[in-house]
Amino acid sequence: MFMTYQPKKRQRKKEHGFRKRMSTQSGRNILKSRRQKGRKKLTA
């Protein structure tokens, strides 16, 4: 067995970053709900 999580900063930002979230309606809904909840960090 090997470790399946091989972290990459660029890939993480591309998939879960702020601009990616803003690009779709559902992504904006995610940000909205996280703001309402009072999350310190909205995105990765």
Curated annotation (Swiss-Prot):
Regions of biased composition (Basic residues) lie at 7-22, 31-44
Keyword list (alphabetical) reads: Ribonucleoprotein, Ribosomal protein
A single Gene Ontology MF term assigned here is: structural constituent of ribosome
One Gene Ontology cellular component term attached to this UniProt record is: ribosome
Domain of life of the native organism: Bacteria
Q: Where is this region: Disordered?
A: 1-44
Q: Name one Pfam family in it.
A: Ribosomal_L34
Keyword Ribonucleoprotein present in the record's keywords: the answer is: yes
Q: Which GO terms describe its biological process?
A: translation
Q: Which family does it belong to?
A: Belongs to the bacterial ribosomal protein bL34 family.
Q: What's this protein's name?
A: Large ribosomal subunit protein bL34
Originating organism? Clostridium beijerinckii (strain ATCC 51743 / NCIMB 8052) (Clostridium acetobutylicum)
